[in-house]
Amino acid sequence: MRDNQNDDGSYFNYYPITGRPPYGYTNDQPGWMGWMDAGIIVPWQVWQSFGDIRVLEEHWDSMVRYMDYLERQANPDGSQVSSGIGDHLAIERTDIGLTNTAYYAYDAHMMSKMAAALGKTREARKYAALYDKVKAAFVAKYINEDGVTVAPYVAFRWPGMPVNPNAPKDGDIIPVDTQTSYALPLYFGLLDGELRDKAVAHLVADIEEHGNTLTTGFIGTPYLNPALSEGGRDDVAYTLFEQTKYPSWLYPVLQGATTMWERWNSYTIENGFGPVDMNSFNHYAYGAIAEWMFSHQLGIQRDEDRPAYKHILLQPKVGGTEDFAKGGFETPYGRVESGWEKTADGFVYRVSIPANTTASLTLQAAGPDKVKVLSGAEGVGPFRALKGRVLCELQSGSYEFEVRN
């Protein structure tokens, strides 16, 4: 990405770039927000996952050039322009300015954290202030007092297309009210307090209105279930996760899928193959649900302030129709494993924490009297109760807990 970064600081949508128009692309044109932001998100994810600060050092100047590009094209209030394709292949259309502004805020948040890690105090303050500015602009422009997402109407007409006299006028504020329009600001931390609660409620209402199916595209899908779980609606997240109707994660599986497809219906038993254009059968975007499976179903999460899983946040969410869930992965300190199994009166939770790390555990339990340590008690800190949850600190080691309803 650095080698092919455009002179204006923008990135293209994918690399390497091959061919020439109309069948290929040149790298002298900016890509789309949601794609270009990989220039910020990838270094962030590498650093957070592995703790290697060198990737930030090597990529810093490139990231600054990209942020400068975004700042030049932003509106005076801090919101972003409506350019690009937005939530690609979504069932419901979400205003592109809304999604671009949400990503701009997220970029600023990551830049502030990475600047602080590099000892760039002034830059850390600059990007933190930018995040606050864009966050305020997002709420002012795209959220009404009832917590519903809105946006200025922009007419789209092909040349020669007749004007609909009943259509809104350009600039009229109209509802957006899509799943993506709530998932992004919720996940990116743009909504606080009552507005956050209202947005979660509107998100759930939209899901229910669509028969408990998702309507998100490439931009919204990765954040949909995490936003629900962080908003206290694990029940809805599990309903979506297990849904088999179109569109859903399991719908393609029932049509014979063994890979992630570009479209939910790239192939159906009833109708066969879809259009040959944009119909990839090996297209990871919707596979982002795997992140929720690890971070919420199994509950293995990173601590942003202590990268590389030096400190692990464990918040397993037991739910759905599954009898058990278990899994893990290698961290720089060793393998972390987490799993739960339902019982007649609750569940049993097992976890292994690598050497030279610690963890904060949050269990779904009515109170400390409902939690029993079956093994590893010597490494378990005191229990604390908080709103239907029990919290404790863990040292490295293996543990087993019994939680009763």
Predicted features by range, described:
Residues 1-71, 85-86, 219-221:
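Substrate-binding groove/exosite segments of carbohydrate-active enzymes
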Residues 1-4, 43-56, 180-192, 221-231, ...:
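Alpha-helical support elements that line or immediately flank enzyme active sites
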Residues 1-2, 55-61, 119, 195-208, ...:
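Short alpha-helical "patches" and their helix-cap loops
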Residues 10-17, 71-273, 393-395:
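Catalytic cores of carbohydrate-active enzymes
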Residues 30, 173-177, 281-284:
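Short Gly/Pro-enriched turn/cap motifs at secondary-structure boundaries
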Residues 37, 41-44, 102, 109, ...:
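A structural signal for well-ordered alpha-helical segments within the folded catalytic domains
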Residues 48, 53-55, 67-69, 115-117, ...:
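Acidic/polar, glycine-enriched structural segments that form the non-catalytic walls/loops
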Residues 235-405:
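Non-catalytic C-terminal accessory modules of carbohydrate-active enzymes
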